[in-house]
Structures are given as structure tokens and as C-alpha cells.
Amino acid sequence: MSYIKMKDNCRNFSLSKWQDTRKPWLILIIVTIGLTCIAHFLFQEYLFMKPCEQCVYIRFDMLVMAIGGMIALINPANNIIKIFSYSLAFYGIWLGLEHCLTLNHIHEVVHSENPFAGVDGCREIPIYPFNLPLYKWAPSWFLPTGECGMDTPVVPENAYNHLNAFQKFFIGTPPDFENGLYSNGWYLIPSLKFMNMAICCLIAFLCCFVVLFAMFIAYVLDKNKPNAKIFALVIVALVLVLKFIGESKNPNQNIASLNQVVLRYS
């Protein structure tokens, strides 16, 4: 009976109908906010891994996607709601892919034998889209305090005597902190230095893109939604507008050269 019921459910499943429900958008919110909270509370606050410029940008990208999901929860079947929810979700993914690739490039350069090749710089004061001063509104979340490409734990001396066994397992024991799982930085498999944080975040953004794009195509091709193609064009246009109008360039911002950062570790 359970097999027959499962077979009927598969037959009745429609991606177009599913994207009209709150479930996929709720999953998107849980994933993006969950990853952001893990980065902040676990890695930054608990394991003393300070976020760099690209790291806080990735948090912003996740937040943009989550806001898109929250808007969709109002009425996911409404076309006007879809315009804002899909646009923000795709916009956040676009930014996220760019920032992950940049972070991975910086990580590879900093850990290579020639750390001065191909790196422009790392800002101490971040520049967010539309010049949003997020680093002022929520500095603990959106102000970079770490070095570009260096995600090793930086434990303050006043915390040496207060580390528990769980923390020591990941960051090591004082004063050298060389025997922890993440003493050489965060990797999915630390012993092999396999898949750094940038690559894992990149995969997360790609997975979100694949699911959302499949939902978007199902919405466009739904024969019961004759105006879907028009709304889809509006969504694409809005994503482009957000991307290119949101780009902010302020030459007066304080910029710290990444070459100076690398000199500290050379």
C-alpha cells in the first residue's frame, strides 16, 4: 500500500505546482539563514575564525536570497510576489557565485608559492550594493575583521584559559594552536585540504540555482499560466537592473592591499 501511495504521489507531483507552494521557499530560507548563522555563531564567535571581506559579502548574498524567500511566503502563487521573490533569489545567487570565485582565487593565491600574483586588494571597509552601510548597522555580522584568504583561528589571549574540549578539538591548544582540526584553515576534509570554504559555499549557491532555475522554467512553461512568460521577462530584467545599478564604486573607501596582508605571513 505504501508503495502504491508513493507511486501515486510521484505521478501527481508537478514542479510547477510545487513552486506555487511555500515549501521550496521555506527550504531556501532555512538553508541560507542556517548557513549564515553557522558562519557567524560557530566559526566566527565560537571557533575564532574572523571573516574577511568576501566572507561578509557572501553573508549578504545569503541574506538577499532569504529575503526573496520571505517575500514568497506571503503568497507564492501570486505573479507580482514571484517577480520580487525570484528576482532577489537569483540576484543573491549571482552575487554569491562571484564572491565565492573571488574568495577561492584569493585563497589559492595566498597559499601558493607566489602570493603576489593576480590579486587586486582586500578592503578593510566593505562596499555593499547600493552603498548599504551594513558594516555600521551590524558590524559583528558584516564588518570584515579577518585577513583575505586566511581562515585560520585567531584566538585572543584572554580566552586561552576558557577553551573547552570541543573548541580545542577544532582550533588546537594554546599557545601555538597547531594541533586542531582547523589549525591550517577550514576544509571539508582538513587532512587532505580538500574543498575550502569558498568552494563549499560555491556548491551551495549552485545547488540553490539549479533548484530555483528548475522551478522558474516550470513556472514559465506552465500552460495554465498564460502570462508567465511576460512575468519571467520582468524577472530577468529586474535581476539585471539590480546587478548593474547596485554596483557601487567608491574610491575614497579605505583599501588595504592584500600584498601587505601576505607579507605578515611570508
UniProtKB/Swiss-Prot annotation:
Keyword Calcium among UniProt keywords: no
Intrachain S-S bonds: 52-55, 122-148
Record key words, sorted: Cell inner membrane, Cell membrane, Disulfide bond, Electron transport, Membrane, Oxidoreductase, Redox-active center, Transmembrane, Transmembrane helix, Transport
SUPFAM superfamilies: DsbB-like
Pfam families linked to this entry: DsbB (PF02600)
Membrane-protein topology: Multi-pass membrane protein
Keyword Transmembrane annotated: yes
Molecular-function annotations in GO: protein-disulfide reductase activity
Location within or outside the cell: Cell inner membrane
GO cellular component: plasma membrane
GO biological process annotation, one example: protein folding
Bilayer-crossing regions: 24-44, 61-81, 83-103, 201-221, 226-246
InterPro entries: DiS_bond_form_DsbB/BdbC (IPR003752), DsbB (IPR050183), DsbB-like_sf (IPR023380)
Main location (coarse class): membrane
Job of this protein: Required for disulfide bond formation in some proteins. Part of a redox system composed of DsbI and DsbL that mediates formation of an essential disulfide bond in AssT.
Complex formation: Interacts with DsbL.
NCBIfam families the UniProt entry points to: PRK04307.1 (NF003304)
Assigned protein family: Belongs to the DsbB family. DsbI subfamily.
Protein name: Putative protein-disulfide oxidoreductase DsbI
Species in which this protein is naturally found: Campylobacter jejuni (strain RM1221)
